[in-house]
A protein has these predicted regions:
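Active-site-proximal catalytic alpha-helix in oxidoreductases
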Residues: 1-38, 64-65
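NAD(P)-dependent Rossmann-like dehydrogenase/reductase catalytic/cofactor-binding core
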Residues: 30, 34-115
């Protein structure tokens, strides 16, 4: 849930991890985390929406000045791990936020011949 909330959001918004603590990025990160928690529950993992969102906030606070690995990939114009994170959530359940984040990053990758 943490990676789904932080990585794609920071990569697309071009912000450090702490940027997901403020709106509107916090809304996107929290929604992606909630969808991921739902996918986890459907797979038998006990993860509440509240716990997933709290984990995103805790990691974002602890790593506020850090650049996520996905944002680092974007900066270096490398293919990202979006398929394994947000894409995986969107494949398992109806997850419009994760699907949108994955779609936007995949479009960015295609435009650079990375996929």
């Amino acid at each position: 849930a943490v990676n789904a909330g932080i990585n794609a959001t920071t990569a697309l918004a071009r912000i450090e991890n702490g940027g997901v603590l403020d709106d509107p990025a916090s809304e996107v990160a929290a929604a992606a985390a909630r969808e991921t928690a739902r996918a986890a529950r459907e797979a038998g993992v006990d993860l509440s929406d509240a716990a997933a969102v709290a984990a995103v906030q805790e990691v974002a606070e602890a790593t506020a000045d850090n650049t996520s690995s996905m944002y680092q990939d974007v900066l270096a114009e490398r293919r990202t791990e979006v398929d394994a994170i947000n894409g995986a959530v969107a494949e398992r359940i109806d997850a419009p936020v994760n699907r949108t984040l994955a779609g936007l990053l995949r479009a960015w990758e295609r435009a650079r011949d990375l996929r």
